[in-house]
Structure formats: C-alpha cells, structure tokens
From Swiss-Prot:
SMART domains: CoA_trans
Originating organism: Clostridium acetobutylicum (strain ATCC 824 / DSM 792 / JCM 1419 / IAM 19013 / LMG 5710 / NBRC 13948 / NRRL B-527 / VKM B-1787 / 2291 / W)
Protein name, as recorded: Acetoacetyl-CoA:acetate/butyrate CoA transferase alpha subunit
Annotated positions binding CoA: 24-30
One Gene Ontology molecular-function label: CoA-transferase activity
Protein encoded by which gene: ctfA
Length: 218
C-alpha cells in the first residue's frame, strides 16, 4: 500500500488560483488550522470556500478572509467575523448564506451523487430568491443544489496510516460529510497512529475516502 502521509511542501501542486475548497470545522473546533496556514502562505487567490463559518478575524478560516484570498464564500454564519461583513458590504466578497442544516445536506447530497435537497427551510425569506420551488403532495419545498469541491481540508482527532479517521466529540461537525464531497481529501491528523492502533469500528471516515494525511507543522 502506498503511503498517504505527505509533507506540506509536497502539497503545493494540488492548489491553484480559482479553486473550490471545503474546510471543516465549527468556529475553529475541528478546523484544520495548519492546512489553513499553509494556504495563507501559498497566497493563492480567487478561492471559493465552503465552510460553516469564517471564525474570527485572523483566526482559522478568518485568515483567508483577511488575506484577501477568497472570492466567494458559501457558509451558514459570518457574524463572528466583522472582516467578512465589511468585505461583503464593500462588494469585495460574494457571500451565499445557507441555513446550517441545509448546508450540510447540500454537502451530503454532493458526496452521494444526488441532484439536490428538498427543504421547507427558507421559504418566504431571502433564502428562496432565485431558487426553484417544487410541490409534493400539496407541500411546497425549495430545491437546494448539491455542493462539491476540488479539495476538502478536514481534521481528525486520530488518523491511522490508511486514512481511517476518528473525530472526538463535536470536532466531527462538517468533517465527515466534506470528506465525501471533494475530488481530493486531505486530513490534518491531530494524532497519527499505525493501522492496528485505531479500532476499525471507531473509524468515522473510512480511509478509502482520504487521499493524503499531514501531521507535522507547516
């Protein structure tokens, strides 16, 4: 079996301007901060970022916002980062807000090859603008389109050398769903162990979905 473990400098060829990147985490809980720092140092631009939030100014995903690397953001919450709001109102950043449950279902749909998600969330609000409505048995739904990415950056609490990944507590959040929905998946391992050290029933993301593992500081 070829090793999935890779050094940060060998990831450079995977990233370029204009990419769509999913980043796991919830206000920096379960967020691959070393991989984000790596992206900041690469200074690639015009990115579309799919994430739950943009954390805080100059923290986590907020570093990408502060460094003017993001062209479009698809997220459920931006209130904790004033920089995101300023860029939105100054027309420096396109923001698509998606309710949190809808966002994760759109990601799950993308990973499962589904054509979209039907939901009543957002009906009668600004969320429905420009979206198709479908009536089923007399009930109206919004059609939310699936989300996929070129690369997903996720974080695992324990990752074995085959890529099987365990998330501790709420660090799970968006990570396992994003691992299903991208062409290339890179996991930042908090603890990297040999294959026999992680009980397979604890693997929340199977190694077959993981392309690369990083551990050392960027």
């Amino acid at each position: 079996m070829n090793s999935k473990i890779i050094r940060f400098e060998n990831l450079r060829s995977f990233f370029k301007d204009g990419m769509t990147i999913m980043i796991g985490g919830f206000l920096n809980c379960g967020t691959p901060t070393k991989l984000i720092d790596f992206l900041v140092n690469l200074n690639i631009k015009n990115l579309t970022i799919i994430s739950n939030d943009t954390c805080y100014p100059n923290t986590g995903i907020g570093k990408l916002i502060s460094n003017n690397q993001v062209k479009k953001l698809i997220a459920s919450y931006i209130g904790s980062n004033p920089d995101t709001g300023k860029k939105l109102f100054n027309n420096e950043l396109e923001v698509e807000l998606s309710p949190q449950g809808t966002l994760v279902e759109r990601i799950r749909a993308g990973g499962s090859g589904l054509g979209g998600v039907l939901t009543k969330t957002g009906l009668g609000t600004l969320i429905e603008k420009g979206k198709k409505k479908i009536s089923i048995n007399g009930t109206e739904y919004l059609l939310e389109l699936p989300l996929t990415a070129d690369v997903a950056l996720i974080k695992g609490s324990i990752v074995d050398e085959a890529g099987n990944t365990f998330y501790k507590g709420t660090t799970k959040n968006f990570n396992p769903y994003m691992a299903m929905a991208a062409k290339t998946v890179i996991v930042e391992a908090e603890n990297l162990v040999s294959c026999e050290k992680l009980e397979k029933e604890k693997a929340m993301t199977p190694g077959v979905l993981i392309n690369y593992i990083v551990k050392e500081p960027a």
